[in-house]
């Protein structure tokens, strides 16, 4: 192999695939363990630094493989400690990744696609349309970049304790790559994050949710956002294909396979005058009866292309009270990082807009020097 483009990126390979890769080189499978630790635990991307492998193997790896993460094009920390990155992937596409610190916990919100095809009416990402799925290397690369940003650090004081697949895209529409990336998150030789602390959020691709339960036992979040099909059809068009009853039945099946008594998280974006009334909350109580779950209320974050409005905090708390009194543990998501960005999906759009303007300016200057 001669071109760098032909090299295999090892960053997204879980242990089993990396072992198979080394076998094709005529090497023992334990080499995969060594490389996993170098890449993910130590943040190394240079084979020459992997000093517990022979020089000849390192030279061979440089010929056929690479360790390549996303390029950081934006990195800023808000007053409340929230840190946001825009990372450029292959083909010049960008995604955003957000780290939310909360005491001893650090939750990283990771993207699975560039854009999104679901076109949920309250989501700014969907307005950009769908471009492509991220590779496993591009997904785990977001964790890799974020972790490296804090190196060196005390192993007992890890900056990333939780990962949520809640960024741009629908994870279950990028099934294989998302599963590979989550396996790396939970791999003891890589990030060693507990399966309870890795959460996949889905709008409800029911067949893929059933398939997910056969291959992993990460925590589950359901993007519900409405207490009935009529309203959810308007907010989440996917509901027309997989209505609420089918989605909640699949959620029950998934939870029944877990080895522990874990609950699903029900995500509910609260939109003024749309789904924020006490009667909506009471309808939700009936809908979720018997489902092991907790509820996370997300006050709508306005963005330019939407006519929806953020509800008052009083309205959101009234909604919460109905659910709490019915016995559901219900929290209101705190808006973080307002001073550096607003809703998910807006930051990357603004950065790409600036990039396009810069490219147009350069092109004009080249034509008219």
From Swiss-Prot:
Keyword line: 4Fe-4S, Cytoplasm, Disulfide bond, Iron, Iron-sulfur, Metal-binding, Methyltransferase, rRNA processing, S-adenosyl-L-methionine, Transferase, tRNA processing
Reaction it catalyzes: adenosine(2503) in 23S rRNA + 2 reduced [2Fe-2S]-[ferredoxin] + 2 S-adenosyl-L-methionine = 2-methyladenosine(2503) in 23S rRNA + 5'-deoxyadenosine + L-methionine + 2 oxidized [2Fe-2S]-[ferredoxin] + S-adenosyl-L-homocysteine; adenosine(37) in tRNA + 2 reduced [2Fe-2S]-[ferredoxin] + 2 S-adenosyl-L-methionine = 2-methyladenosine(37) in tRNA + 5'-deoxyadenosine + L-methionine + 2 oxidized [2Fe-2S]-[ferredoxin] + S-adenosyl-L-homocysteine
EC number, as in UniProt: 2.1.1.192
Protein localization: Cytoplasm
Amino acids binding S-adenosyl-L-methionine: 169-170, 201, 223-225, 301
PROSITE patterns xref list: RADICAL_SAM (PS51918)
GO cellular component: cytoplasm
PANTHER family: 23S RRNA METHYLTRANSFERASE, RADICAL SAM CORE DOMAIN-CONTAINING PROTEIN
Reported cofactor(s): [4Fe-4S] cluster
Domain of life: Bacteria
Family statement drawn from the similarity comment of this UniProt entry: Belongs to the radical SAM superfamily. RlmN family.
One MF annotation (Gene Ontology) recorded for this entry: tRNA (adenine(37)-C2)-methyltransferase activity
Classification via SUPFAM superfamilies: Radical SAM enzymes (SSF102114)
Domain Radical SAM core: 102-338
Co-factor binding details: Binds 1 [4Fe-4S] cluster. The cluster is coordinated with 3 cysteines and an exchangeable S-adenosyl-L-methionine.
Enzyme class: transferase
Stated role: Specifically methylates position 2 of adenine 2503 in 23S rRNA and position 2 of adenine 37 in tRNAs. m2A2503 modification seems to play a crucial role in the proofreading step occurring at the peptidyl transferase center and thus would serve to optimize ribosomal fidelity.
Binding positions ([4Fe-4S] cluster): 116, 120, 123
Protein name: Dual-specificity RNA methyltransferase RlmN
Catalytic site positions: 96, 344
């Amino acid at each position: 192999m001669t071109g760098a483009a032909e090299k295999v990126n090892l960053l997204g390979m879980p242990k089993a695939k990396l072992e198979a890769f080394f076998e094709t080189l005529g090497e023992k499978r334990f080499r995969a363990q060594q490389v996993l630790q170098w890449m993910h635990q130590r943040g190394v991307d240079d084979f020459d630094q992997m000093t517990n492998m022979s020089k000849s193997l390192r030279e061979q790896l440089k010929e056929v493989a690479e360790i390549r993460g996303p390029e950081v094009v934006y990195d800023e920390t808000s007053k409340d400690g929230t840190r946001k990155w825009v990372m450029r992937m292959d083909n010049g596409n960008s995604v955003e990744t957000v780290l939310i610190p909360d005491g001893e916990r650090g939750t990283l919100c990771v993207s699975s696609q560039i854009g999104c095809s679901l076109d949920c009416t309250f989501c700014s990402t969907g307005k950009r349309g769908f471009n492509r799925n991220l590779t496993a290397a591009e997904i785990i690369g977001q964790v890799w970049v974020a972790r490296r940003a804090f190196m060196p650090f005390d192993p007992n004081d890890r900056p990333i304790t939780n990962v949520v697949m809640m960024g741009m895209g629908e994870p279950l529409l990028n099934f294989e790559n998302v599963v590979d990336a989550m396996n790396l998150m939970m791999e003891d030789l890589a990030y060693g994050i507990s399966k309870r602390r890795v959460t996949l959020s889905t709008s409800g691709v029911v067949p893929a949710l059933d398939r997910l339960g056969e291959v992993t036992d990460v925590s589950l979040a359901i993007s519900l956002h409405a207490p009935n099909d009529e309203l959810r059809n308007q907010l989440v068009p996917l509901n027309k294909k997989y209505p609420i009853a089918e989605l909640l039945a699949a959620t029950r099946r998934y939870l029944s396979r877990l080895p522990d008594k874990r609950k699903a998280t029900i995500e509910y974006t609260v939109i003024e005058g749309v789904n924020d009334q006490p009667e909506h909350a009471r309808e939700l109580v009936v809908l979720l009866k018997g489902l092991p779950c907790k509820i996370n209320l997300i006050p709508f974050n306005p963005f330019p292309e939407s006519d929806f409005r953020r509800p008052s905090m009083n309205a959101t708390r009234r909604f919460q009270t109905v659910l709490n009194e019915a016995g559901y543990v219900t929290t209101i998501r705190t808006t973080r990082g307002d001073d550096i960005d607003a809703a998910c999906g807006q930051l990357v759009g603004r950065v790409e807009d600036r990039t396009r303007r810069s490219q147009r300016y350069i092109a004009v200057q080249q034509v008219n020097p």
